[in-house]
Amino acid sequence: MIEITQVNASLDEAGDENTCLIVGKRVAKRILRCKDSEIKSIELHRKSIDARKKRDVHFILSFRVELTSPHLEREAVDSVSERDRSRVRAIEDDEPSFPSPVSDAPQERPVVVGAGCAGLFAALTLAKAGLKPLLIERGDPAFRRSHAIDLFLKERILDPESNIQFGLGGAGTFSDGKLNTGTKNPAHRLILETFVEAGAPRDILWDAKPHIGSDILPKVVTAISQRIEQLGGVVRYRTKLVDIRIDASGAITGIDVQSSEDAACEPIETKHLILACGHSARDIFELLKDHNVALAQKTFAMGVRIEHPQRDIDRAQYGALAGHPALGAAPYKLVAHLPNGRSVFSFCMCPGGQVVAASSEPCHLCVNGASLNARDGRNANAALLVNVTPEDLPNDDPLAGIELQRACEAAAYRLGGSNWNAPAQLVGDFLAGRASKAPGKVKPTYPLGVTWTAIDEALPQHIVESLRLGLPLLGKKLRGYDRPDAVLTGVETRSSSPITVTRDRTCHAVSTPGLYPCGEGAGYAGGIMSAATDGIRCAEALIADL
């Protein structure tokens, strides 16, 4: 296999996979000095947008080419000109795979708690290994979860167990399904291929900034859960972890679950528990603390959602080529380093998306962002965040970060009017230190409505001060970012977990053998791809322990 990188292509000649492959074959024949008949296969491996020069926005492509024989491939690589040599390399075709079925699988099922991406991929990995895992999820399957969210949006009745945070697919299902990751791992390709097999669009295999969309993700995670069941696993919904059982040596011996508030606790025996509960399962972290499971504070981030007209972001990013059908809605990623030593940064940017109601606790309001697959909404939105370090917390309690989140969410609920309206403020008013009274040209998309106010009292002072310092600096990096009528909606508190469930190199909780803390909630991931990767890692660690 040969990889060819840094192939420039115009917007008109590389709009879709087929046109990209035409470009790739033409370039491969020139660089590798081969004939059409000598190319056995060619695949588009990566596609990104180069918008550094607004007059020359174009695609950068990379391809993987297989010739008809290894000998021919070696000759082709050796014949590459000096000018192109840095763009061509021979690679091994050793794509990662799920583990094969283990011999002498134990009768006792391993248990996975949480059906977000970490839990789903942990359970799928165990199922592929023939271990028939039990996957328990406190929320609903995807279609019933959608009904619970609709009820919240229409009647303002929050279901604490089935909402934007809880249910099949976890928090990522209804927050766009972005598959960006800042790390490289061989498992990423396996995860993307699994998503495609489950119904995700093929372009996630090569798009440099892949996303699935909140309209497609429910079907995808449903298909993955069904595959787990086909392989002998069991998936149980509306099943909540209420206790863990630990023997005198500190090892896991089982768990207790509950299917409803008034149901009796059901004991489940297991010596292997993957805990992938997500960052919003605060009751689980309290349970772990009660059982003296090792926890630690970690840096997390909080702030607001900021909204701009998507057309303005497109023009700022793509210039005169904004609106070209091959480009779609423009994303952005920004950071400003401040004189006070802190930073303000964008996170989870949703092109053509909307701000969503992400609450999971009564009288505690938080927001997130989401896009459908088409990304064709009128506004762009992103979280605008500032880090909260352990030094910012009032004490060394490992749950102090959770209590700060809760305090901010309770304040946001009150500021919004105690009716699930979100507090909102215009950027110009926020910078001037005055409350807002009405929107400008940018209309907020938060679906339950907003209350115009000042958001200061819903956030720690260091975050408010940093946002005020950072917005004008970000406006210098992306034209119009600090426009006076851009909308700030509060509060964004769930971007990352404020705790770490401490584990060793073998993925065991350091205090509790048999417990495998996993994913974003445990402090080992930050998004769909890293969570899924950690799910596979923990499952492989469990398999190695058998």
Language model feature labels by segment:
Residues 1-59, 65-198, 202-546:
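Residues forming the flavin
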